[in-house]
Amino acid sequence: AKAVKEQLADFSDAEELRIRAELVVAVLANKLKETKQELSAKLINYFERDATWMDDPDMLRIIGNSTRVIDFNFLATLMNKLLVKYQKIDQYPLDTQKRIGNIFVNYLHVLYDYRAKRMARKYINFLQNLPGIPELTLDKLMGDYYDAVFFKNEKGLAQTLSVLKRVVPKIVSGLPEK
């Protein structure tokens, strides 16, 4: 990943790729904490300059992968913009629906880390109201999971975790409450 990052430095129009490479290198080298502030500044700068980021699948992927890196307050602004844009998510292609669902699942994890319960409800509702198709079932389940976690529904948490443990046990190991 470091070699790719260095090769990308030669391209003036590859800023999005450079940011993604830096993010990958930081994660693989287990240096996310050390580079968080610098990466966050680069991401903020990029999003502020690029008005089309909400329509760009690569930028949406970067947002989904960097929710724990971006400054919390700036991230809240980005998430609110996405929530407004994608209110009628069923009108978008399936890939976009999945990507936005994944972004909001990652964001709910950040909200949990920050104990930002008041901010969580609208993202939980979004996930729970995704179209009822198999490809979005996991995101809907994660909405149920975070609903139970944030709003202390022990029975709902036990039921949702039971399903998640059978379907995606590796994901359960990374969840905040098991």
Please identify what each model-predicted range represents.
Residues 104-143:
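Intrinsically disordered, low-complexity segments enriched in Gly and acidic/Ser/Thr residues
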Residues 149-178:
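C-terminal non-catalytic interaction modules
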Residues 5-15, 44-56, 81-97, 125-137, ...:
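Solenoid-like repeat scaffolds
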Residues 13-23, 54-62, 98-105, 136-142:
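Generic helix N-cap/helix-start motif at coil->alpha-helix transitions
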Residues 19-31, 63-68, 104-111, 141-148:
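Conserved small-residue packing positions in alpha-helical repeats and bundles
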Residues 70, 112-115, 152-155:
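Residue-level detector of the short coil/turn that links helix A to helix B
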Residues 1-44:
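Charged, helix-prone or intrinsically disordered regulatory segments positioned adjacent to compact structured domains
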Residues 1-4, 32-42, 72-84, 114-125:
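Helix-turn-helix repeat elements of alpha-solenoid scaffolds
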